[in-house]
Structure formats: structure tokens, C-alpha cells
UniProtKB/Swiss-Prot annotation:
Species of the source: Acidobacterium capsulatum (strain ATCC 51196 / DSM 11244 / BCRC 80197 / JCM 7670 / NBRC 15755 / NCIMB 13165 / 161)
Record-linked Pfam families: Ribosomal_L29
Stated name of the protein: Large ribosomal subunit protein uL29
Disordered as annotated region, ranges: 67-91
Family under the similarity heading: Belongs to the universal ribosomal protein uL29 family.
Tagged with keyword Ribonucleoprotein: yes
GO BP terms: translation
Keyword Ribosomal protein: yes
Keywords linked to the UniProt accession: Ribonucleoprotein, Ribosomal protein
Taxon lineage: Bacteria, Pseudomonadati, Acidobacteriota, Terriglobia, Terriglobales
Biased composition (Basic residues): 79-91
Length: 91
């Protein structure tokens, strides 16, 4: 599925397409294990489609919630050499 088509889908349609692609992927993997098909190219395309759909879905979730909070504080941490100097000065 093309990226433009995926971006134009609603959230509900994205979920439906994700479920369809997952089911097709399951069936294709099962057929490959049973030796009924050699659809390696189709398997690769389905995996990429699932990744595209989930990426677009995740982008929408993050846009609603805003940016992720920063993990570190803005104040610089003391280095070991500064800590040692302050201990020596205290004595």
C-alpha cells in the first residue's frame, strides 16, 4: 500500500488495515511453513505495509500528546574531579 493512501485513512480505517495485514501475514507465514508457497516477496511487502501503518498510527498519537518530556535536567552534573576538590576544601 502506498504511503499517501495510508496517510489519508482515518484512525479506524488504519486499525482495520493493520488487522487485515496482520492476518495476511499470519496466513502467508503458515503457508510457507507448510511448504505450500514460496511468497518471500509478498511476505516482505506485507511486513513493510504493517510497519508503515503502525508508523503513521504512532505519529498521530504523538502529535496529539505532544513531544516526549526530556529525560535529563538542564543543570550540568558535577564531575568526579569537582567532587574531589570540594571534599579536599571541606577538610
Amino acid at each position: 500500500m502506498e504511503l499517501d493512501k495510508i496517510r489519508n485513512l482515518s484512525d479506524e480505517e488504519l486499525k482495520v488495515e493493520d488487522n487485515k495485514a496482520q492476518e495476511q501475514l499470519f496466513r502467508l507465514r503458515f503457508q510457507m511453513k507448510m511448504g505450500q508457497t514460496e511468497g518471500v516477496k509478498k511476505l516482505r511487502e506485507l511486513k513493510k505495509d504493517v510497519a508503515r501503518i503502525r508508523t503513521i498510527s504512532r505519529e498521530r498519537v504523538l502529535a496529539i500528546r505532544g513531544a516526549a518530556p526530556l529525560a535529563e535536567s538542564s543543570a550540568p552534573a558535577k564531575t568526579k574531579s569537582r567532587a574531589r576538590k570540594s571534599k579536599k576544601e571541606a577538610l
